[in-house]
Swiss-Prot record:
This is Zinc finger CCCH domain-containing protein 16. GO terms for biological process: mRNA splicing, via spliceosome. Residues 1-77, 93-128, 358-678 are annotated as: Disordered. Residues 19-34, 519-528, 665-678 have a biased composition (Basic residues). The keyword Zinc applies.
Amino acid sequence: MSTAAADPAAAADAAVTRKERRRERKKERRRRARREAAEAARKAAEALAADPEEERRLRELEEAEADASERARRAFEDAERRWLEAAAARAAEKAAAAREESTAPEDSSREYKDDHGNGTEEDDEWEYVEDGPAEIIWEGNEITVKKKMVKVPKKAKENQPIQQDKAHCPFHLKTGACRFGVRCSRVHFYPDKSCTLLMRNMYSGPGLALEQDEGLECTDEEIEQSYEEFYEDVHTEFLKFGELVNFKVCRNGSLHLRGNVYVHYKSLDSALIAYSSMNGRYFAGKQITCEFVAVTRWKVAICGEYMRSRFKTCSRGIACNFIHCFRNPGGDYEWADWDNPPPRYWIRKMAALFGPSDDSIYGKPSDTPHLERSQSSDRRRPRSSDPRYTPSRTRDEDAHKQHSSRDYSHSKHERSSHTEHRRDRKESSASDKHRHREIKDKTSKYSSNMESERESHKYMREEKHRIDHGNGGKGDHGKVRSRKNRSERQESLEPGSSGRSSDFIDQDTTESPSGSKSTGRHHKKTRRQSLEEHSTRRSSRHRDMEDDGRGQSVAVKRKDHHDTSDDRWVATNSDVDSDLETQYQRSSSEGSKLGMKYHARSDSETGYGRSRSGTTKSRRERKRQSGNGERSDTLEVTSDSDTRDMSSDAWRSRSRSSDENLSTHRSRRKRSRSSHDS
């Protein structure tokens, strides 16, 4: 049993022994190979060292390296020497130039004293400046510039105590507030009374965020609307006490400027009244504390970079110690930010509120930079002479559409005269509309009859004339009519003939030309006489009614319209006469009954179309005149002779004659058809 246990242990020891022996053999082989390689390398090195050629080559390499290093050292030394020489030369030149510059003023002053004598006092009061552009002279490759100098008195330097005063705090003098407060090492000046009032931390609306994340809670429109409401309330209240020069609200994030309200009055009395009235009052749940500050120069109080960026930002951010103000609605008091006088429209507006001012505070020129003005800054203000100015944003927007921003106030007498004039025009226009309605009612019963009678009568007259010419001038019994009889019959059928008096018709008949004269000349003479008589009656009526005022002038216009309608009828008659002569020549050249019938039918259709177009034109003219009468300011009821001519009796007689002519025309047409069929 013990022998079996000892056999595995011996076998394990034998296995370990074999591995170790194999590992030892490998190590020995490696050591032998390394020793052999080292021995071979030593022998090769000894062989090379013993070779004379190899020794010579190594010596040559060492000598070449030594020569190269020597050349590099010599080149460096030469360059260093040259640089030192150049530096010494430059230093010598600079020293010489400095000596010349130091001696030049002494030489020039000595020469000037020799030329002008001992005028030291005059030299202190005068200086030499350039007069005009310099003269440039080209001489080959050289350019010579000559400047003309003139002697002028020296300008007095402006005293700037704010920058030169080291005792007083500059920020407190400029803005009336200092971030150090009572801990400031410089003097803070608090005046007993001043034209400028300061209300600290009065505005607490949006736009005063200390952290940038708080600005995300309100949009720019909400901030602008909130400040506009604050401006309307506070500015209106402070404007009650007197004229303002500037009104500013700070939007800085610093505690000493945050929400400060500055009110700069033009007069000291107004500032004192505002102080006594506003100090201790409550606004938005907080008590107002007013104090006087010596801030009168707003150009140095407001941040210039902030103003140039159009109320956007500056490089110092909200922690800037200069004023970052809200932009007033409508761009109010922007001129005061640059210490400039207000525009003329603002002066007129303040004069309307507080009366004209004799103070010359605005007598200095403007130095406002030309900045791009936004559209919203041009807000219009309504005209107002109320001593208690109460602005409203709604009224300003309405006034923006009606009035100019430079035209605000007129006197009370001028406005009252405009009001009375508008009232008179309204009353006259109402009375004139009533009169026009009465005229329209009186004349409406004739319009339909006139239109129908004119159309039917004109068509019948043209048909009658064409039939007469188509039959070669024959009458009812086949007799040939003379030109005189035909012209008389045409006169009896003209629409204007019924409106004439009996003596006028007799005169035309007695003065009618003989058969040898043409019908056109006879009609021209009668038309000329009728036109002269109508113009004489129209001018006489116009002179009688000329002095009756505005309503009478409109009545004359209506009567002239009736006269022009008569003239239009006369022009239509001349057209008919020309058509009759042309058609008579055409029918004579044809010579056949069929041709005459064809031409009569076509001409009748043409005449009917012309009469329809003339009737449509007259209807449009009457409609236009009636529309103009409704839009006119004044209308007067007048008795017109032309209206009396359109009475019912006249139209009844004309319709009776037209019926007789129509029956005659039908009988002739039947006879012509029967003769043609045969």
